[in-house]
Amino acid sequence: MRDIIKDYGKLETEKRERGVLDEYAEMCRYQNERQRKNNEDFSDEDLTVDEQENIDSGKEQNLKRENTQNEQIKEMGQVVLDSNSRKHKVELLTIIGEVEGHESAPSHSKTTKYEHVLPKLAIIEDDEEIEGLLILLNTVGGDVEAGLAIAEMIASLSVPTVSLVLGGGHSIGVPMAVSADYSFAVPSATMVIHPVRSNGMFIGVTQTYRNMEKIQDRITTFISEHSKASQKRLEELMLDTSQLVKDVGTMLEGKEAVKEGLIDEVGGIKEALAKLYEMIEKEC
């Protein structure tokens, strides 16, 4: 008798569960049907001419903006980052390959042309909508005057700036990396510090040496003023003969660059953007 009662109770429970499931399934079918009818009832025909024109205009503007961004990325590696959840408008600037200055680099070389970068930095300073600048660096160095000009421009911007060294920040790339308000380097990044070099004919050895010494002093002064590394330590790293086989100088990896005070922190794009957003919000 107990088994019969038990089986009966089990059967009733199963019926109730099936009933709940059937009721839930029916409710889902009803909601789906209602949504389908709503979609059918609302069509482009219900929009006024002005509403339809606004929609078409918005689509056209988005398409133009996307095409412009793609063209900027293709030509100069520059784009505006404004799709983040915090709604901040950030300019992205990439400095890659060789920094090209007063003389054109070989046609097969990847270059960053300073005549493209300087006007862009001026636009960033002038545009009230731009809230910050993120600089991505992977450069072998290049023209000293051009590199220092870019570094000075970045350092003088009023908006928050963050740099991220990817791959390499060599030679004149070091001042550009430290010119930002805050700097990052990925763990595998390298930074090479070496004495100033020059190609071509030297008329007077003494005069040329003094000129090179002044240029080198300008570089080390800028780096020491925009990082935690002292000028004395920078000169020691520049003149080190124990690291580079065919050259004088020092190669520092990500963590070593932080330890020497050149770079503020080891990190990637996530950390760099998070820091930039934090700096922007502190200024608001």
For every predicted segment, state its role.
Residues M1-L164, G168-I172, S179-H194, N199-C284:
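N-terminal organellar transit peptides
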